[in-house]
Amino acid sequence: MSQILTSRQADELHRALIAYLTAANLPNTAAALREELNLGEDVFDPATAKKYEGLLEKKWTSVVRLQKKSLTPLVTQIMDLESRNHILQSELDNATPTSRQNKDPVAWLPRAPPRHTLQSHRDPITCVAFHPVFSSLASGSEDQTIKIWDWELGELERTIKGHTKAVLDVDYGGPRGNTLLASCSSDLTIKLWDPLDSYKNIRTLPGHDHSVSAVRFIPGSGNLLVSASRDKTLRIWDVSTGYCVKTLRGHAEWVRDVCPSFDGKYILSTSDDYTSRLWDVTVTNPEPRVTLIGHEHVVLCCAIAPPAAYQNLAAMAGIKKPPATSSAEFMATGSRDKSIRLWDARGTCIKTLAGHDNWVRGLVFHPGGKYLLSVSDDKTLRCWDLTQEGKCVKTIGDAHGHFVQCIRWAPSVIKDVSVNGDNGEPNGTPKKGAAVTPDSQIRCVIATGSVDLNVRIFAN
């Protein structure tokens, strides 16, 4: 006892024990202890006994409270570690060997930590887009600016100013040999910027009556750009003239996102009206070819599957032979109902992917066709294996410190790249549906943007 307690502490413990035994109506035991410790009536009188009465119980309950206080966060931490261990074990069980993954772009998936965290925006990041060839990345923010980064070096190259409200989306594309950057904003406008002329604003496209939510160059068209707006419409623009050539009406509420098919014939849109619509834009007056109904809340994002994914998605849909076209045969949508839905061209939901704990903000198909990637307000990036019925095989927890609002995959590099940086991929995906061909090379690079003001680069 003397090795643990000082003489004074030991004496106080003895007195507290005697007081406890006396109060517990155990006088014989108390007397035996007093005799053993040589604590006579002159030393341990009634006043002293009163002083130490209840002291032992107080000390004991304090220790119990301290143990609970100390153990509760420890138990939580253990449960969290067990959960992470379960996720990692699941990834290990479902993954190919790491060495093969690193060497095979078709099997590559992002992993933490990111290669770069790009910081400069002063308000939440809303969008990101890769240059089709060069190592340039554009990011848009609620701070009204667009920033151009070198994603390989992790360095800021320039800040573009021109919009007077939040920048909501950006995309690279345009005429062959003359890649442009398009941006759209809550200021109701779309702006075109020339990367070859220090990102000079070469044209502003007015016409929408409310915030412009999304912009995408249409593959194969060269000059055509599609936009989605809170005014409930989509518009198709000729970027060489600045004229709106078609207006698509059909949604009952805010149109949130838009994605053109790989052959440029179809456009998929999502809306606050809980629906997504597939439009045939080859006709003079486009109308929805099919309306996708099933989500229980606002549909925030969409993606059209590359032909490389058709075999996996066809099997999931129970189709023996995958489609041979490069049109919008399969699609994915993400919603505030926390789910992702996979659809076929007939408008049938072939699978619902559940796992996110908050709004699904962004979707992108792996160019190799095996995976679908998603980001969410739950701060995670998830990878869904289309060869395993859409099973979630990888989760990057805390991919950001706040809501993850956007995700883009760097477009594949085509071997016959022109000197001006056009590779036939106006919207970051190969022309004519050739998602992965002998003449293209997958770039294993992903960018995400968040409310935490950071853009993150995940790369092999």
Swiss-Prot record:
Pfam families: LisH_PAC1, WD40
Biased composition (Polar residues): 90-100
GO cellular component: cytoplasm; microtubule; microtubule associated complex; spindle pole; transferase complex
Coiled-coil region list: 74-96
Molecular-function GO terms, alphabetical: dynein complex binding
Region Disordered, residue ranges: 90-115
WD repeat copies, ranges: 120-161, 163-203, 207-247, 250-289, 294-354, 355-394, 399-439, 441-460
Record keyword Cell division present: yes
Locations listed in the record: Cytoplasm, Cytoskeleton; Cytoplasm, Cytoskeleton, Spindle pole
InterPro entries recorded: Dynein_regulator_LIS1 (IPR017252), G-protein_beta_WD-40_rep (IPR020472), LIS1_N (IPR037190), LisH (IPR006594), PAC1-like_LisH-like_dom (IPR056795), WD40/YVTN_repeat-like_dom_sf (IPR015943), WD40_repeat_CS (IPR019775), WD40_repeat_dom_sf (IPR036322)
Gene Ontology process terms (BP): cell division; establishment of mitotic spindle orientation; microtubule sliding
SMART domains per record: WD40 (SM00320)
Entry keywords, A to Z: Cell cycle, Cell division, Coiled coil, Cytoplasm, Cytoskeleton, Microtubule, Mitosis, Repeat, Transport, WD repeat
UniProt main location, coarse: cytoplasm
Family: Belongs to the WD repeat LIS1/nudF family.
Function: Positively regulates the activity of the minus-end directed microtubule motor protein dynein. May enhance dynein-mediated microtubule sliding by targeting dynein to the microtubule plus end. Required for nuclear migration during vegetative growth as well as development. Required for retrograde early endosome (EE) transport from the hyphal tip. Required for localization of dynein to the mitotic spindle poles. Recruits additional proteins to the dynein complex at SPBs.
Domain commentary: Dimerization mediated by the LisH domain may be required to activate dynein.
Assembly with partners or alone: Self-associates. Interacts with NDL1 and dynein.
Protein name as it appears in the record: Nuclear distribution protein PAC1-1
Species for this entry: Sordaria macrospora (strain ATCC MYA-333 / DSM 997 / K(L3346) / K-hell)
Higher taxonomy: Eukaryota, Fungi, Dikarya, Ascomycota, Pezizomycotina
